[in-house]
Amino acid sequence: MKFTPIKTLAAIALLCALSSTAYAAKIGDTEFTYGGYIKLDAMWSDYSAGAPAGTSVGRDFYVPSTLTVGNDNSSDAVFDMHARESRFNFGTATLLDNGKTVKTKIELDFLLSAPGGNERVSNSYSPRIRHAFISYDGWLFGQTWSNFQNVGALPEALDFVGPAEGTVFVRQSQIKYTTGAWSFSLENPESTITTAGGGMAVTDDASLPDFTARYTHNADWGNFVVTALARQLTYKVGGVDADETSFGVSASGMVKLGEDNLKFMLTQGKGLGRYVGLNVARGAVLNGDDLDAIDSTSGFIAYQHKWNSQWRSTFLYSFLSADNDENLLAMYGDPTESSQSYSANILYSPVKRLTFGAEFKHAERELESGVDGDMDRLQFSVKYAF
């Protein structure tokens, strides 16, 4: 199919004209879709060991590694409000001459954007890419959720992630092939390594992509997903050339309980690092000229109850435990040993696309030395999906 500038402009004009009542338009053999949501988050957070800096991402949503630890007498409460989770996406689906369909999607939001925004005058923030991919005949090329992650297992929460320390959570460039219940991918590699003194090195020196495999079972009662990951951790700095093989497996799913549902995930691995817990535990420790991968176990369980057609609640528990080598503590400092959180919310949708909600979250983080800290957060949100 050939696209002329006139047809392209016509498609854009039609989408704009329909934006208040519809979110798809078809020009020739191509269907254009547009969607997203606007969301306001207002949060009151009380930290036992003092609040993170105002520029910390942990002030926008719960990130376990940013939870402060230390003196309980440093309790500090802060209030934050933003609309940075708001997002929009644009997609196409084109029927080709061979009878197959090629699809594209791009989605952006405003979280974690580069410096440039501020809260003094304009509160302006740059957009960032969440998804940008092409799919054709079982293949996917581009950036989207890792094949190692089951996005469908994430519970409904007001916090951006929800079970932050307990879930696999990665978006990255990849080549993925899906056939039936199976999917396999080659994904962008990256390593987070603890160096002497507790510093962190983020390296991109792997000679091989990360490899994942996934099996999905769907049934009337819900679904069950098993995923596996194999990757190469590397550190090539200052004359050191070290690498280590890392493995992990994750099981997750959703069980229907009438109108309610139960969602869960359990992940175990060696050197998982950035793949779980928003990188609260690193992938490996530099031990001389070698890398020692860090074992970790993480997971969550969430129950959602529908009070009626407009009101619902999610009750969530999430955890991560890292098995740090105690013999190396003197060299790489005092890393995170465990992180956990629990939350409960109440959500009200007077109409399908509009949601008002309140959520309470309690989170804890403990270092290997026993030093710890906690946070209590009360969050109010309003969201309209379009």
Where are these regions (language model features)?
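Gram-negative bacterial Sec-dependent N-terminal signal peptides
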Residues: 1-24
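Transmembrane beta-barrel strand/turn architecture of Gram-negative outer membrane proteins
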Residues: 24-34, 103-106, 227-231, 243-257, ...
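Outer membrane beta-barrel
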Residues: 25-55, 63-65, 69-193, 205-208, ...
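Outer-membrane beta-barrel translocator domains and adjoining extracellular loop/strand segments
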Residues: 48-53, 115-124, 151-160, 190-207, ...
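Transmembrane beta-barrel outer-membrane domains
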Residues: 79-83, 122-129, 166-170, 204-208, ...
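Transmembrane beta-strand segments that form the barrel wall of outer-membrane beta-barrel proteins
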Residues: 103-112, 182-188, 224-232, 312-321, ...
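Detector for outer-membrane/organellar transmembrane beta-barrel domains
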Residues: 219-336
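Outer-membrane beta-barrel "beta-signal"
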Residues: 348-350, 354, 374-386
